[in-house]
Amino acid sequence: MNGSPSAMKGTTTVGVVCRDGVVLAADRRATLGNMVTSKEVTKVFQIDDHLAIAGAGLVGDILSLVRLLRAEAKLYRAKVGREMSVKALATLVSNVLHGSRHLPYFAWFLIGGYDVKPRLYSIDAAGGVTEERFIAAGSGMEFALALLEENFSDGMGLDEGIDLAVRAVKAAIRRDVYTGEGVTVVAITKEGYRELEPVLK
């Protein structure tokens, strides 16, 4: 990866709740100002068997939080004997971001997971949390959200959700210069976390 990870920005992320799972998707481009510094950046990360996070913002801040969350998830399992809930992970992220206001994380996070049902949370850089049925974050979010709002329906199947999330990121790729290089797609269902083949076109 070229450039400083702390200065590189990741751009458009998307989350969709389906009947039988949650889909998280993101583009693969990182930029430094107007320069493309990487075409293979990962912006969606597994935290535990049924928990994942997607980040739009400074790559270094995103990776730092992911390391912290993975450690906290392991500690929670060791203490409690089970995986934390999706809401508990969202609350943890919110507390970390809120407590770091004087040295903030420059990123916006989507938390997706499955406990008793599929859940999706959006968390801004100040720690504000909202539960969503669908959401987009990052520089291309307005283009992705327009497509999501027009095409999302409650109770859609997982395959439909995957297709919708990919199309939403592609809509951002077409219109936003900071979004590009294909789409990373992850599905979290009752069976667990599954990363699909990247969509490169």
UniProtKB/Swiss-Prot annotation:
The protein's Enzyme Commission number: 3.4.25.1
GO biological process: proteasomal protein catabolic process
Record keywords: Autocatalytic cleavage, Cytoplasm, Hydrolase, Protease, Proteasome, Threonine protease, Zymogen
Catalytic activity line of the entry: Cleavage of peptide bonds with very broad specificity
Listed GO MF terms: threonine-type endopeptidase activity
Root EC class: hydrolase
Pfam families: Proteasome
Record: active site: 11
Propeptide: 1-10
Activation/inhibition comment: The formation of the proteasomal ATPase PAN-20S proteasome complex, via the docking of the C-termini of PAN into the intersubunit pockets in the alpha-rings, triggers opening of the gate for substrate entry. Interconversion between the open-gate and close-gate conformations leads to a dynamic regulation of the 20S proteasome proteolysis activity.
PROSITE patterns xrefs: PROTEASOME_BETA_1 (PS00854), PROTEASOME_BETA_2 (PS51476)
Top-rank taxon, per record: Archaea
Main location: cytoplasm
Subcellular compartments: Cytoplasm
Family, as annotated: Belongs to the peptidase T1B family.
Protein role: Component of the proteasome core, a large protease complex with broad specificity involved in protein degradation.
Assembly and binders: The 20S proteasome core is composed of 14 alpha and 14 beta subunits that assemble into four stacked heptameric rings, resulting in a barrel-shaped structure. The two inner rings, each composed of seven catalytic beta subunits, are sandwiched by two outer rings, each composed of seven alpha subunits. The catalytic chamber with the active sites is on the inside of the barrel. Has a gated structure, the ends of the cylinder being occluded by the N-termini of the alpha-subunits. Is capped at one or both ends by the proteasome regulatory ATPase, PAN.
HAMAP family, per the entry: Proteasome_B_A
PANTHER family: ATP-DEPENDENT PROTEASE SUBUNIT HSLV (PTHR32194:SF0), METALLOPROTEASE TLDD (PTHR32194)
Protein name per its UniProtKB record: Proteasome subunit beta 1
